[in-house]
Amino acid sequence: MASNNVAQFAAELKMPAGVLLEQLQAAGVQKASEDDALSETDKARLLDHLRKSHGATDGDKRKITLTRKHTSEIKQSDATGKARTIQVEVRKKRTFVKRDDVAEGADQGQAQVAEADDDAELKRREEEARREAELLEKQAQELRERQERLEREEAERRAREEAAEAERRRAEEEAATKRAAAEAAAAQQQAAAQQAAAEQEATPTQSAQDEARAAAERAAQREAAKKAEDAAREAADKARAEQEEISKRRAAAEAEARAIREMMNTPRKAVVKAVEPPKPVEPPKPAEAKGTLHKPAKPEGAQARPAVKKPAGAAAPATTQAPAGAGDRNKKPGAGKGGWQDDAAKRRGIKTRGDSSGGVDRGWRGGPKGRGRHQDSSTFQAPTEPIVREVHVPETVSVADLAHKMSIKASEVIKVMMKMGQMVTINQVLDQETAMIIVEELGHRAVAAKLDDPEALLVEGESGTDAEQLPRPPVVTVMGHVDHGKTSLLDHIRRAKVAAGEAGGITQHIGAYHVDTPRGVITFLDTPGHEAFTAMRARGAKATDIVVLVVAADDGVMPQTKEAIAHAKAGGVPIVVAINKIDKPEANPDRVKQELVAEGVVPEEYGGDSPFVPVSAKTGAGIDDLLENVLLQAEVLELKAPVEAPAKGIVIEAKLDKGKGPVATILVQSGTLNRGDIVLAGTAYGRVRAMLDENGKPTKEAGPSIPVEIQGLSEVPGAGEEVIVLPDERKAREIALFRQGKFRDVKLAKQQAAKLESMLEQMGEGEVQNLPLIIKADVQGSQEALVQSLLKLSTDEVRVQIVHSAVGGISENDVNLATASKAVIIGFNTRADAQARKLAEANGIDIRYYNIIYDAVDEVKAAMSGMLAPEKREVITGMVEVRQVFKVPKIGTVAGCMVTDGIVKRSSSVRVLRNNVVIFTGELESLKRFKDDVKEVKQGFECGMSVKNFNDVTEGDQFEVFEVTEVARTL
């Protein structure tokens, strides 16, 4: 289409509109914006301006440039003999200039300049190629000369060594000759001395002169021998020093030659730089040996095997071929003479053992997958030591993945684990510690991996929130021993009857309420006092600002009171003591104060920091003083939290409702929770579909320190989990799934590691009775408390085995699991549905319902007592004294006895005592009175008795009659 304005014309020319406006203004066409109209006249004026600015005088073309590209294929064999097809592309560029009579001189000058430029460029390239070839030839010549010089020096060294050896032999021969001459002279002197001794009397003066002359000759001979030995030693030292000097020079020359070969084999560019003389290459220093956590460092001698060196002369044939076509690689195909043929010739050069490319570097496209890139192919490098890898080990890893990280087969890992005494498969999950031991056993270095944890995003998000900190209500936890009146006290504050609604009159759930008082809002957490609810009390202390410790004035400090004090001190929370039940006649507040001082809680009147307030939950006395002290402590703490920010909190309690699904009671600690927010609590996530306050009324938002009940989570969260509001559901799902997988993998790895230990424990314990149980509770805290209480009942003979524990009603799956594991189902404040009851009756599964934790613990204890082996006890029923002994044929010995104490029964066992020492224990064979068999004989009567398998009865013996009874044991 026709371009009517500046913008369209610029789009047609494919150039920015701003640049076109500048060119139009330079041509004298005044256009202010891109939308201005553009006529054909304006375009013509712009074209004339551009032609003039680029040197054209008129519209005729003076010069034309032709570019021609030709592509062909050649077949070339590589180093392995395999034929390869290579694409060859030739590009040519020619410029034709149209000559005019008027401007012929100028055009001719321009053509000459262009030709001169082309010739200069061509000459420059040829000169560069020639210089590079000369440089490479010069380097090769220097290398050859250096090699020849080394050979000459080696020959000279050998000649010098031979001369030194000959000199040493000659010196040794001369020394031996001199020693022989000295020995002969000594023998002659000895003979002369003997002869002189005979003539001593005649010529004493002549004998002394001969002795002096002989001693001088011997000294001269010893001096000559010593000089000969010194000369031989000096010649040997000189030869050794010369040999060491030659070795050093040869090593330096070899290093220099190796450096030159490496430089010649690296890819060369067209631009030739000044070549510096190569420096001697120092041998690489061995890496510092480092030990690891599970495996110490190897000794110095075992770090590496010595490298196999190749003689320097072996690399010369391959190196001397390098200059032949070194410059052709960077030339254009048309510039050199047979560049491809020279390359092929180089590839067909002499090969070494470790070089498959013919001794020539192939450059960036030399081999498949970049093999041989920048490597020194002229020398063979044998592997010096095994490759040590740094293996990053995550928290859990399968055997196959671990083998892949070490680049070995999975069977090698399985072999190592079999040697360590563990049978595994390739899909088995290992924990981090075991995996690190295996990695170090295989000679690699193990590093604990830092996981790509999506939870790190939560920390980043927290650092970016800068909301205004505003005052918030205090969170007060009411703690104390069971039946000390915690809930009744809170009930009086709330003006509602909560304690009456709890089963058995004891609190079994953690309750959260906020109360509007004339002095401000206070949030109360009511915790159970029973010993089974330790975890609940710990959670209450964790989420609280102030602890109100309730102690009964008539009961004093009890075990759960001490535990509550420990929780408060561990959390660094201030304590306000409420001494309850002061309206009772037996109340003794002073005794309570003394007991609390012993536990480290000192009242303010004694110089401490804990207010003590006497109260009565029944009459309401002291309640106002208690609230006053609580709010005073809150003012001292200066409690603040951001309000206009995403909510954060803690799960106080959680349960599974049949109609509502997972329900969680949470305490908002900072920010504001709105209906519709995306929340993450542990492994559970979801959108807040409904939000209720503690009275069951719907609410749209909850600020800091306000407890609410939310619905819409994917599963029942764990009590005590942190609750966070996230911007989108995808992020919440990702973090929740990551936590689930991490928890599952860690649990599986720990179970696998503990299998062998548990097996050995069971083998050592022998016969242990197991009581399998399946526990279903209404809320998370009750289920947790019940499981802990029942597990504490386990003994060495009877063990409680929790097969499964969860929150919610009893379903068919629970009954099927109980059938398979032969377990008893315990429902705490839950019931079984119709299908589950029918299935339980059909399979004979025992389902027991409880709503008080005392009853559940007591009945399980009774069941465990019934599983204990009965205890056997002996009961002495009577004492018998032997008065006379009768020998009866075919029967044996019969004792005539008098029952002195108790009663004797025919079925009883008996001990025979002689002089108060037991000599036999057995059973009665017969019991007669006169000639009649009787069942029993009482005290004061006579009877005849015979003991089975015992006839050695004498007068005066005593029979102790006893019975063995079985007594049921209790825990």
Curated annotation (Swiss-Prot):
<dbReference type="InterPro" id="IPR006847">
    <property type="entry name" value="IF2_N"/>
</dbReference>
<feature type="region of interest" description="G3">
    <location>
        <begin position="526"/>
        <end position="529"/>
    </location>
</feature>
<dbReference type="Pfam" id="PF11987">
    <property type="entry name" value="IF-2"/>
</dbReference>
<keyword id="KW-0963">Cytoplasm</keyword>
<feature type="binding site">
    <location>
        <begin position="580"/>
        <end position="583"/>
    </location>
    <ligand>
        <name>GTP</name>
    </ligand>
</feature>
<keyword id="KW-0648">Protein biosynthesis</keyword>
<feature type="binding site">
    <location>
        <begin position="480"/>
        <end position="487"/>
    </location>
    <ligand>
        <name>GTP</name>
    </ligand>
</feature>
<keyword id="KW-0342">GTP-binding</keyword>
<dbReference type="InterPro" id="IPR023115">
    <property type="entry name" value="TIF_IF2_dom3"/>
</dbReference>
<feature type="compositionally biased region" description="Gly residues">
    <location>
        <begin position="356"/>
        <end position="369"/>
    </location>
</feature>
<feature type="region of interest" description="G2">
    <location>
        <begin position="505"/>
        <end position="509"/>
    </location>
</feature>
<dbReference type="InterPro" id="IPR000178">
    <property type="entry name" value="TF_IF2_bacterial-like"/>
</dbReference>
<feature type="region of interest" description="Disordered">
    <location>
        <begin position="101"/>
        <end position="381"/>
    </location>
</feature>
<dbReference type="InterPro" id="IPR053905">
    <property type="entry name" value="EF-G-like_DII"/>
</dbReference>
<feature type="compositionally biased region" description="Pro residues">
    <location>
        <begin position="277"/>
        <end position="286"/>
    </location>
</feature>
<dbReference type="GO" id="GO:0005829">
    <property type="term" value="C:cytosol"/>
</dbReference>
<feature type="region of interest" description="G5">
    <location>
        <begin position="616"/>
        <end position="618"/>
    </location>
</feature>
<dbReference type="Pfam" id="PF08364">
    <property type="entry name" value="IF2_assoc"/>
</dbReference>
<dbReference type="Pfam" id="PF22042">
    <property type="entry name" value="EF-G_D2"/>
</dbReference>
<dbReference type="InterPro" id="IPR044145">
    <property type="entry name" value="IF2_II"/>
</dbReference>
<dbReference type="InterPro" id="IPR013575">
    <property type="entry name" value="IF2_assoc_dom_bac"/>
</dbReference>
<dbReference type="GO" id="GO:0003924">
    <property type="term" value="F:GTPase activity"/>
</dbReference>
<dbReference type="Pfam" id="PF04760">
    <property type="entry name" value="IF2_N"/>
</dbReference>
<feature type="region of interest" description="G1">
    <location>
        <begin position="480"/>
        <end position="487"/>
    </location>
</feature>
<dbReference type="InterPro" id="IPR005225">
    <property type="entry name" value="Small_GTP-bd"/>
</dbReference>
<dbReference type="GO" id="GO:0003743">
    <property type="term" value="F:translation initiation factor activity"/>
</dbReference>
<comment type="similarity">
    <text>Belongs to the TRAFAC class translation factor GTPase superfamily. Classic translation factor GTPase family. IF-2 subfamily.</text>
</comment>
<feature type="compositionally biased region" description="Low complexity">
    <location>
        <begin position="304"/>
        <end position="326"/>
    </location>
</feature>
<protein>
    <recommendedName>
        <fullName>Translation initiation factor IF-2</fullName>
    </recommendedName>
</protein>
<dbReference type="InterPro" id="IPR015760">
    <property type="entry name" value="TIF_IF2"/>
</dbReference>
<feature type="compositionally biased region" description="Low complexity">
    <location>
        <begin position="105"/>
        <end position="114"/>
    </location>
</feature>
<dbReference type="InterPro" id="IPR000795">
    <property type="entry name" value="T_Tr_GTP-bd_dom"/>
</dbReference>
<feature type="region of interest" description="Disordered">
    <location>
        <begin position="48"/>
        <end position="86"/>
    </location>
</feature>
<dbReference type="GO" id="GO:0005525">
    <property type="term" value="F:GTP binding"/>
</dbReference>
<comment type="function">
    <text>One of the essential components for the initiation of protein synthesis. Protects formylmethionyl-tRNA from spontaneous hydrolysis and promotes its binding to the 30S ribosomal subunits. Also involved in the hydrolysis of GTP during the formation of the 70S ribosomal complex.</text>
</comment>
<feature type="domain" description="tr-type G">
    <location>
        <begin position="471"/>
        <end position="640"/>
    </location>
</feature>
<keyword id="KW-0396">Initiation factor</keyword>
<feature type="compositionally biased region" description="Basic and acidic residues">
    <location>
        <begin position="121"/>
        <end position="181"/>
    </location>
</feature>
<feature type="compositionally biased region" description="Low complexity">
    <location>
        <begin position="182"/>
        <end position="203"/>
    </location>
</feature>
<feature type="binding site">
    <location>
        <begin position="526"/>
        <end position="530"/>
    </location>
    <ligand>
        <name>GTP</name>
    </ligand>
</feature>
<feature type="compositionally biased region" description="Basic and acidic residues">
    <location>
        <begin position="48"/>
        <end position="63"/>
    </location>
</feature>
<feature type="region of interest" description="G4">
    <location>
        <begin position="580"/>
        <end position="583"/>
    </location>
</feature>
